A protein has these predicted regions:
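Catalytic loop of the DD-peptidase/beta-lactamase superfamily, centered on the K-T-G motif
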Residues: 1-40, 166, 170-174, 178, ...
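Active-site-proximal loop and beta-strand segments within enzyme catalytic domains
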Residues: 3-4, 18-19, 23, 31, ...
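A short secondary-structure junction motif
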Residues: 36, 110-114, 136, 179, ...
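Hydrophobic aliphatic residues
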Residues: 91, 107-111, 180, 240, ...
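Short, mixed-charge aromatic SLiMs
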Residues: 92-100, 176-186, 262-266
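An acidic site on a long C-lobe helix of protein kinase domains
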Residues: 102, 152, 229-232
């Protein structure tokens, strides 16, 4: 395959990386079993100035879902699970309010269950989360609409553990990582620490890039915790391009199981990313999105989590694949789609395009700080008008203190578990999951909590203390905009 990304194109990518404060980026385009064209730009550690390599690992975030779907599909081949029977037939403790919930519903995002991303990560076990699922609310009718849900993939991984007595991580290694020779891939924080070649995660706040601590994703590995390298992700995508067969000719997934993974089970309504967008997203299978690119079918998935972004895509009829990763949380649309479209156009269709330039002009490089709109989209405010309209200065300090009895204590919710309220240096603090955050006074028993991490979002949420039984309090926290506050 003729080299697609020459010096001029690579320089354009590097200019955009500099503009968006991207520390490092790696990508590969490949056809069939030919030598992939790989490029490693920038740095895995911006402070130490250490360069990217094809073996450098990234958190793959939601691309992990394609691995989980493969593990569950393998267990279906072995008769230990079934996509179309209620999951309680196999894992009785994994109960939902919707009693007909199947693994296919869970892994195609059609369950109707609200996101509930506040549940993870943390020090809970997957078994504990499984016992909490029966208490969680839906916000859509069952099987009515596509709604992305990380928690359901965590539970699909737990189902695999429950029927085998082995950890999801060991199943992944035995069924796929080992046979595919993916020696630069793991699914634990310990694996990240041991590899010695992990890209450091970064995120932009305002207009300044900050290095982040690694976010322990061990609980949520089946949804977002697999880490891998460019070398290994090329192997993973090629395995799917070959229909579930290794390069040595060994079939790891039956044709039926592979077909179920890559067949849409729910439609997706998606707007074009840019005018004249050649990529049309149509549906979701099991851990893979699908649609057409220039009228040709594709399979893809993207991932985004604390400090990392990634995309995998392949066109089966063109025997062409593409993988890209960077150690920055957003803005993947401008960079990723521009590079990806240029790569696919030339590799699969023989068209020399300039999508990167178009994305730059239409979505990015306009005005001194225009590109930073991409970062502002990572923040959401769930506070309602009665919170937003209050002058917090009027209720701060001694006057506000007199309004409250002792709010400290441990509060429980059967679906969300335990949170703790305590006072530190005169400020009320709320501990939940892996975060300790200050409660900013609003009025009466109302507070606002900033900096709540849920999946890819940083949230501002309202917190209210309401009178409870025996003269105590209940804590109401609005962790999900589509649901009433969670009552602890």
């Amino acid at each position: 395959m003729k080299e697609i990304f020459d010096g001029e194109r690579l320089q354009a990518i590097e200019r955009m990386m500099q503009y968006y404060r991207v520390p490092g980026l790696v990508f590969a385009v490949f056809r069939g079993d030919g030598e992939p064209e790989m490029h490693c730009l920038g740095e895995k550690n911006a402070e130490a100035k250490t360069g990217m390599e094809p073996s450098t690992r990234f958190c793959m975030a939601s691309i992990s879902k394609s691995f989980t779907a493969a593990v569950v599909s393998k267990l279906c081949d072995e008769g230990k699970l079934d996509l179309d029977r209620p999951v309680t037939d196999f894992v009785p403790e994994l109960r939902y309010r919707e009693k007909q919930m199947t693994l296919k519903d869970m892994m195609s995002h059609r369950s109707g269950l609200a996101n509930h991303d506040a549940l993870w990560p943390g020090d809970k076990s997957r078994a504990e989360v499984a016992r909490q699922m029966r208490y969680l609310d839906s916000n859509l009718a069952f099987r009515s609409k596509y709604q992305y849900n990380n928690t359901q993939f965590v539970m699909a991984g737990y189902a695999a553990e429950a029927v085998t007595g082995r950890t999801f991580e060991k199943l992944l290694e035995e069924y796929f990582l080992g046979p595919l020779g993916m020696t630069e891939t793991s699914a634990t924080e310990a694996g990240i620490k041991a590899c010695g070649n992990m890209a450091e995660p970064y995120r932009v706040f305002g207009t300044t890039r900050h290095r982040l601590p690694f976010w322990n994703m061990d609980l949520a590995v089946p949804a977002a915790g697999v880490n891998s390298s460019l070398n290994d992700m090329v192997k993973w995508v090629r395995f799917h391009m070959a229909g579930g067969v290794t390069k040595e000719g060994e079939r790891l997934l039956s044709e039926k199981a592979f077909r179920e993974m890559h067949t849409p089970h729910i439609g997706i309504d998606a707007e074009p990313v840019i005018a004249g967008d050649p990529l049309v997203l149509e549906g979701y299978g099991l851990g893979w999105r699908m649609g057409t690119y220039r009228g040709t079918p594709f399979q893809m998935h993207s991932g985004k989590i604390e400090g990392y972004s990634s995309t995998q895509i392949y066109l089966p009829e063109k025997d062409t694949g593409f993988v890209i990763m960077m150690n920055l949380h957003d803005p993947e649309l401008v960079l990723f789609h521009g590079i990806m479209y240029d790569a696919l156009d030339e590799a699969a269709f023989g068209i020399r395009s300039s999508w990167l330039s178009r994305f730059s002009a239409e979505m990015g490089l306009i005005g001194e700080h225009a590109g930073y709109e991409a970062y502002r989209e990572l923040f959401a405010d769930y506070t309602t008008p009665e919170y937003k309209g209050t002058d917090q200065k009027q209720t701060s300090g001694e006057a506000h203190e007199k309004e409250h009895a002792d709010l400290s204590g441990t509060y429980q919710n059967p679906g969300y578990g335990e949170l703790m309220v305590y006072k530190e240096a005169g400020t009320w603090m709320l501990h939940y999951r892996d975060q300790d955050l200050p409660l900013l006074p609003v009025s009466g028993n109302r507070f606002v909590m900033d900096g709540v991490k849920e999946d890819t979002w940083i949230l501002r949420v309202p917190v209210e203390f309401a009178a409870g039984g025996e003269g105590g309090y209940e804590v109401l926290v609005k962790y999900d905009e589509s649901l009433p506050p969670v009552r602890f």
